[in-house]
Amino acid sequence: MATLREHSGWGPTTAVLVGAWLLTSPGTFGYGESAMAISDRVVGATAVIFGLLAISPRRAWAAWVVFAAGFWALFAPLLLWAAEPAAYLNSTAAGIVLIAMSVVVTRLVDRQAADQPAIPPGWSFNPSSFVQRAPIIALAWLSFLMARHMAGYQLGHSDSAWDPVFGEGTENILTSEVSKAFPVSDAGLGAAAYALEALIGYMGGAARWRTAPWVVALFGVLVVPVGIVSIVLIVLQPVAVGDWCTLCLASAAAMLAMVVLTLPEVVAMLLFLMQRRRQGHGLWQSFWRGGPMDDAAAEPRAARLSDPPSHVWRAMTQGVTLPWTLAASLALGVWLMLSPPMYRIEAVAGDAHFVIGALAITVAAIALAEVAQVVRWVNVALGLAMIAAVWLLPGADVAARLSATVAGALLAMVSLPRGRIRETYGQWERWIR
């Protein structure tokens, strides 16, 4: 472990270099008189001073100061409404690197010297393996790039926002009253959140569900509840704004996939903390420092990204299943969202189709995670709500009402049976119903 910590000394030294870069950037790129110039110089000086201090293992606390500086640099262009593209690029990129070099690199190896055993008791796979996390990290970076493009338009760095499907839809949404209600660029806020998700995805070893529960918890909070709220807000844009956004929908799809892939690791972490508490260990200490878990199994051979594609895909999607019932639920959700323009449903009835269809898609997608199949029961209620809404609310003719009634009834029925479960989950299996 000591050797690994010594090898991670290049993290603080890289932070020093990034700090020097920020110190000299305002004058180099022509924004020396702006608020962003002050921010960059303060962050740069902080990174240089505390990066040098963090090189010594005795002053590991200094790395957290560098982390705080990087965190500010990531959000500073949004809070200060950076008018210069170079200032936005510089501060965002530097913030990402500072966070990575100060905390992520040093946390690539957990407090425990060994990552084994890595498979939770009764489980058939390791939810914290890097191959399991790789698609989440990739989707987070993809979403970051899309959100950054939209943030550039909101901050005035570009004259247009790219939208190959809905024309000016993206621009209309980014300049809508809903977006203007945010004190900062909402697209930029999303970009910063995606960057943090990707960075936290790298942290911890192959057994971080028990060796670094706080990392998994932070990762889960950023991806699951925050992600679900973001998804719902995005898919409801036609109701709130009256337009669609291609990049927003692509981000929502990526976030849904991230939620599904993250849930098994979060469940494993919760089971670990529950066992530690039953054994009399302090929950607070277990949360921050981790520990061993009884009956955990060693991973015979962890999958690698260099393995054959079929093996990698199998490892990436362990814990995810698409039974025909959930596939049908997804299709019915799409049908409900497309029904208003097809049947010319107007007023509140049209909004009900959009809302219930979007929620049905979100619920069915989350239920693709075998550990969360129980949430499919929400679609039973949504199906019944659709039947009631289409007959009680104005704006739909007889054909539209019959279509919604059939779709709602089918949604409720296909959500009743549980789909096939391929993996095993130990004590959590009693909740998979």
Describe the role of every protein-language-model region.
Residues 7, 24-39, 46-49, 58-60, ...:
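Membrane-interfacial helix-loop segments of redox and metal-homeostasis proteins
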Residues 52, 382, 389, 395-396:
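A charge-rich, low-complexity, intrinsically flexible signal that marks solvent-exposed coils, linkers
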Residues 66-73, 379-386:
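Central hydrophobic cores of alpha-helical transmembrane segments
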Residues 75, 232-235, 388:
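Transmembrane-helix signature of multi-pass solute transporters
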Residues 426:
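Active-site-proximal polar cores
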